[in-house]
Structures are given as C-alpha cells and as structure tokens.
C-alpha cells in the first residue's frame, strides 16, 4: 500500500514497473509532514539534490543521463546532454514545491569527472561554451542550475568543490575539506558555512575505537571539536560577516538505529548550535 502511494503520489520521475523499486522513500505527504513538524519548532529543512556526482542511483534507473548510457558505470551526470538539465530542473521544481526553504543544496562534491573527458557530448559542450577544463564544465552546470533556482526565488548552496572552475555569483559555499573553501568564498563576496571534516563530522570515532561502535573512520574528540574557531583571524570584518555559521554533519550508514545516531551526535552537536 505504501509503495502504491509512492507510485501514485504525483512524482515526476518514477518507474512504476521497475522491480528494483523496493523502498527507502518518502511520499510527498511524508515530506510535507516533516517540513511542517520542523517549522513548528522553528527549524527549516533544506533539501539536497546531488549533482553532478553521487548520482549512481539515478543513473542506474536513467542511464541515458550518463556519459556511457549504461547503468552502474558512471556516478556523474552527462553535462553535455540537454536531457540532464531537463531532468534536474523538473526534479528541482518538484522539490521546491515540497520545501519552502530559501536555500536548495545541490551537492557539487566528489564528482569524478572521468566520464566527461572522453564523452563526445561533453567535449562538444566544452567547445561550444569555450570551457578549458572539466572543472569549468562542472562550473557551467552549477552556474546554469543557480540561474534556474534564482529565477524561482531560491538560493543555491553547494559543497566547496563548486569553487573549482569558477564560483557562481550568489552561491553559499559549505567548506568541508578544510577552511580554505570558506575563506575563498567570502573573499569573493559569497557567503560560506564552516563544516571542515576534522572538526565537524560527527560520524567519526569519538574515543578509542576498540571501545566504540563501528564507525566510518576518523577521530573527533569533544575537546577537539570545542577547539574549532569558525572565523579565521585573516578575515576582515566584512568578510567575517559572510561566515554564516557552522554545520555539524552526520552520515548514518554506520548507524542502524535512532539510538545509535543520538549516541554519535550528542553532546558534539551542541557545539555547533
């Protein structure tokens, strides 16, 4: 019954006959309930729709949006394919209808870019747009998606890789690989959020690993997390004002229960409030 609700819930992209559609989803009503529950508690839910990388699941179902045209080969959308933008814009329209947040997160991190280098369509896009590198090709996509979001009254957030190839005019940068991405962003006049992994990733081991549940790796003690200063001394007063805050990240693939998740995020998450 729940799966039928998902199929018939007004989603733009849903392969109803795909036997791999086995669950792990929210219906539109589920999302509206979460957004409303959060809003009652003065919390804004900001959705993240990953692009161009981290898209293996989408490309397994829609392989025509990849450079190879085959499932389970690429993790990045084909930026040379105009259907990629048609797909993503339709997804974002649906997302914006469900989430009233001022910001929409588009990911932008960890794209391998390997498929683009030998893709005829990506090569043509680079030639037509006078792009000198695959980094600039990714930036072309981010610029284009930013304009689409801005035209619909929203603002773009992306991980610090969106700086590579040229930062877009209004993007907010989430600096996860260190502090340098945020510094670069604010010096360019863009807003930034500090979330460097060595201080802000709450899925790391927080004590001796042999005394803790299995984690993805890393090591973040309470003392180290508290030592983080999110506004570098090198910034001017005006630049410092563009640091909008700190974000603590928790990825739950090693956390099978809500209780385990709470164990990992408290008290570390209180540092980031």
Language model features by range: what are they?
Residues 186-193, 197-205, 209-210:
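Polar, glycine-rich mid-to-C-terminal structural blocks
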Residues 50-54, 109-111, 161-163, 176-178, ...:
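Active-site beta-loop-alpha junctions enriched in small/polar residues
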Residues 32, 39, 150, 186-187:
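Anion (oxyanion) recognition and catalysis
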Residues 1-40, 55-86, 114-134, 139:
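Aromatic- and acidic-residue-enriched carbohydrate-binding clefts of CAZyme catalytic domains
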Residues 45-49, 104-106, 156-158, 173-175, ...:
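Hydrophobic faces of well-ordered beta-strands that scaffold small-molecule active sites
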Residues 271-273:
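Conserved small/polar residues in nucleotide/adenosyl-binding loops
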Residues 68, 73-169, 176-179, 183:
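Active-site neighborhood of glycoside hydrolase catalytic domains
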Residues 241-258:
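Long, C-terminal catalytic modules of enzymes
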């Amino acid at each position: 019954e729940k799966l039928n609700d998902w199929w018939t819930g007004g989603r733009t992209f849903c392969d109803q006959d795909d036997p791999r559609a086995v669950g792990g989803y929210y219906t539109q009503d589920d999302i509206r309930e979460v957004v409303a529950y959060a809003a009652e508690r003065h919390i804004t839910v900001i959705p993240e729709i990953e692009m161009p990388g981290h898209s293996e699941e989408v490309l397994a179902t829609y392989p025509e949006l990849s450079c190879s045209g085959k499932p389970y080969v690429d993790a990045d959308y084909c930026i040379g394919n105009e259907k990629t933008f048609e797909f993503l814009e339709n997804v974002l329209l649906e997302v914006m209808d469900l989430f009233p947040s001022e910001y929409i997160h588009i990911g932008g991190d960890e794209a391998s870019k390997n498929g683009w280098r030998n893709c005829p369509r990506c090569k043509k896009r680079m030639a037509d747009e006078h792009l000198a590198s695959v980094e600039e090709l990714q930036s072309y996509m981010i610029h284009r998606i930013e304009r689409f979001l801005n035209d619909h009254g929203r603002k773009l957030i992306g991980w610090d890789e969106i700086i590579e190839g040229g930062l877009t005019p209004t993007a907010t940068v989430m600096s996860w690989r260190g502090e340098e991405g945020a510094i670069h962003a604010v010096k360019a006049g863009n807003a930034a959020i500090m979330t460097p992994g060595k201080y802000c990733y709450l899925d790391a081991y927080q004590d001796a690993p042999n005394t803790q549940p299995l984690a993805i790796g890393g090591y973040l003690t309470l003392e180290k997390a508290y030592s983080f200063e999110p506004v570098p001394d090198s910034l001017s007063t005006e630049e410092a004002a563009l640091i909008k805050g700190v974000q603590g990240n928790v990825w739950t693939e090693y956390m099978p229960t809500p209780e385990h998740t709470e164990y990992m995020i408290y008290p570390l998450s209180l540092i980031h409030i």
